[in-house]
């Protein structure tokens, strides 16, 4: 997969993107035939225990992007630019985005609308592919006053349309639409020549993205309305750990099968 192939999928084949934060998850995503792996700053609230994405640092993101690359070396990987890694200056943004490519990302994702058009252009001119992200942009949640659905007012609808066109004009190869009302997401998708990838934005985007922990049911305390739980791995893992605990307590594990003697043959994997 590459940028040009993704762009050609618009209107022909739906794009499938998932988040992944480590090597084993990335390998599974690759083996499942997922088109794009996003190392999201959702790392913060899904893996690192933060309340939201704002505390996530460049250093943390770089570690996880590199891990994902090792797990799926031939996958198309997009790295989220975390809060304040690109907002302070164009020069700093180019430097930080370049760091992601150096550890294995194929592109970066930037939250924000038309006001970031010049920055997107500079990144693209520097050889860094950019995926845009408009609608609900979690890094700006304090400005929005919460996680609110976007595109409900005419003013907001016009802003989103302008932003999508500006990002396309400046060289973005795709745009994530997050929590945008379905009608507006459809209008945006039809108004730009680059793919839109929806999350909570209805049926008419060119692709869909979900968060790893949401679609696999790894968080029993949180289930966003727009997501679908394709498995309940929290319960699967919980039961496995409970069984391991039970067997150890009762002396049922390890057995002879899992033990070595001076007559054992072969290595640890035999």
UniProtKB/Swiss-Prot annotation:
Pathway: Cofactor biosynthesis; (R)-pantothenate biosynthesis; (R)-pantoate from 3-methyl-2-oxobutanoate: step 1/2. Pfam families: Pantoate_transf (PF02548). InterPro entries: Pantoate_hydroxy_MeTrfase, Pyrv/PenolPyrv_kinase-like_dom, Pyrv_kinase-like_dom_sf. Disulfide bonds: none annotated. SUPFAM superfamilies: Phosphoenolpyruvate/pyruvate domain (SSF51621). Mg(2+) binds at residues 41, 80, 111. The active site is at 178 (proton acceptor). It comes from the Bacteria. Binds 1 Mg(2+) ion per subunit. One of its GO terms (biological process) is pantothenate biosynthetic process. It catalyses: 3-methyl-2-oxobutanoate + (6R)-5,10-methylene-5,6,7,8-tetrahydrofolate + H2O = 2-dehydropantoate + (6S)-5,6,7,8-tetrahydrofolate. Keywords: Cytoplasm, Magnesium, Metal-binding, Pantothenate biosynthesis, Transferase. It is an enzyme of class 2 (transferase). Its cofactor is Mg(2+). Homodecamer; pentamer of dimers. Catalyzes the reversible reaction in which hydroxymethyl group from 5,10-methylenetetrahydrofolate is transferred onto alpha-ketoisovalerate to form ketopantoate. This is 3-methyl-2-oxobutanoate hydroxymethyltransferase. The gene is panB.
């Amino acid at each position: 997969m590459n940028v040009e192939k993704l762009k050609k999928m618009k209107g022909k084949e739906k794009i499938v993107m998932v988040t992944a934060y480590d090597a084993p998850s990335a390998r599974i995503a690759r083996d499942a035939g997922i088109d794009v792996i996003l190392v999201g700053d959702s790392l913060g609230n899904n893996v690192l225990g933060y309340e939201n994405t704002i505390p996530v640092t460049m250093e943390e993101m770089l570690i996880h992007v590199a891990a994902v690359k090792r797990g799926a070396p031939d996958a198309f990987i997009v790295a989220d630019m975390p809060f304040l890694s690109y907002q302070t200056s164009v020069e700093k943004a180019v430097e930080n985005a370049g760091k992601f490519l150096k550890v294995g990302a194929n592109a970066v994702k930037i939250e924000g609308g038309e006001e970031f058009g010049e920055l997107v252009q500079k990144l693209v001119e520097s050889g860094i592919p950019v995926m845009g992200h408009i609608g609900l942009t979690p890094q700006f949640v304090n400005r929005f006053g919460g996680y609110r659905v976007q595109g409900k007012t005419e003013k907001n609808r016009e802003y989103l349309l302008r932003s999508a066109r500006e990002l396309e004009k400046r060289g973005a190869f795709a745009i994530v639409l997050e929590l945008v009302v379905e009608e507006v997401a459809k209008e945006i998708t039809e108004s730009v020549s680059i793919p839109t990838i929806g999350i909570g934005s209805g049926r008419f985007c060119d692709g869909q993205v979900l968060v790893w922990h949401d679609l696999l049911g790894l968080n029993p305390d949180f289930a966003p309305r727009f997501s679908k739980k394709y498995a309940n791995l929290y319960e699967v893992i919980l039961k496995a750990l409970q069984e391991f605990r039970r067997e150890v307590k009762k002396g049922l594990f390890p057995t002879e099968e899992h033990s070595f003697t001076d007559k054992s043959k072969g290595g640890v994997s035999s």
